[in-house]
């Protein structure tokens, strides 16, 4: 948690520096909120070898930002992903499970704090097209279930999360813009730990969480 607070302070300092650099320009702050649908990349369960697939998850972000120039902006966002799982019922391939069918589920809890930057590539009469990226700390843990004797919860791990984004935005009222965006986010791996299963030590956890996100957002000038 201390790492998260330290990196958050650094992120806020960077954002503040960007604002100071642009004070001579007539810009404004904005608040933002985003939500949508996400799917995690396929991953393999370490204990059983079963390749897991994602169900749909809901990414949510809240943040505050600043228009540095007409085509450049930066913001600080606090986000999470709700309801997603990596799961599957299939044939195990690892030792201790070979030849058996098992059900495996990994449910993550992710909290990320990102400092993001965006550049408008083109500006049309009705909408803008932009690209951007973000980086910051993420707290990642997971609940593992399915195989009797292997169910467990991993503790929070602090990772460096990064994000790539491409989208379009349009102004719908004075100081209000909406956007539709695709983003790819890498939140890193969870902690690994060993559990005893039928007299043997079996490694679980260590799942990497990368997601493809389609979101709708709104920015309010303040």
UniProtKB/Swiss-Prot annotation:
GO CC annotations, alphabetized: cell outer membrane
InterPro entries: OMP/PagP_b-brl (IPR011250), OmpA-like_TM_dom (IPR000498)
Residue pairs linked by disulfide bridges in the UniProt entry: none
Keywords: Signal
Gene3D superfamilies xrefs: 2.40.160.20
Highest taxon of source: Bacteria
Keyword presence, Signal: yes
Keyword Signal attached: yes
Family matches, as Pfam families: OmpA_membrane
Signal sequence, start to end: 1-22
Role noted for this protein: Adheres to biotinylated epithelial (Vero cell) proteins.
Protein name: Putative adhesin RP828
Taxonomic source organism: Rickettsia prowazekii (strain Madrid E)
């Amino acid at each position: 948690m201390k790492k998260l607070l330290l990196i958050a302070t650094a992120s806020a300092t960077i954002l503040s520096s960007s604002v100071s650099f642009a004070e001579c320009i007539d810009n404004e702050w904005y608040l933002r909120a985003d939500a949508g649908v996400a799917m995690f990349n396929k991953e393999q369960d370490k204990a059983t070898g079963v390749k897991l697939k994602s169900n749909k998850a809901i990414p949510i972000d809240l943040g505050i930002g600043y228009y540095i120039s007409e085509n450049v902006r930066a913001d600080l966002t606090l986000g999470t992903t709700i309801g997603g799982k990596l799961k599957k019922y299939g044939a195990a391939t690892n030792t201790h499970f070979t030849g058996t069918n098992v059900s495996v589920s990994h449910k993550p809890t992710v909290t990320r704090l990102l400092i993001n930057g965006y550049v408008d590539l083109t500006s049309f009469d009705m909408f803008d097209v932009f690209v951007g990226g973000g980086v910051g700390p993420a707290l990642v843990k997971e609940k593992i279930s399915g195989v009797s004797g292997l169910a467990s919860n991993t503790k929070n791990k602090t990772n460096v999360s990064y994000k790539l984004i491409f989208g379009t935005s349009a102004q719908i009222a004075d100081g209000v813009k909406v956007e539709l965006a695709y983003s790819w986010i890498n939140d890193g791996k969870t902690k690994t730990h060993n559990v005893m299963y039928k007299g043997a030590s079996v490694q679980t956890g260590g799942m990497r969480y990368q997601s493809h996100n389609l979101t709708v957002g709104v920015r309010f000038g303040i």
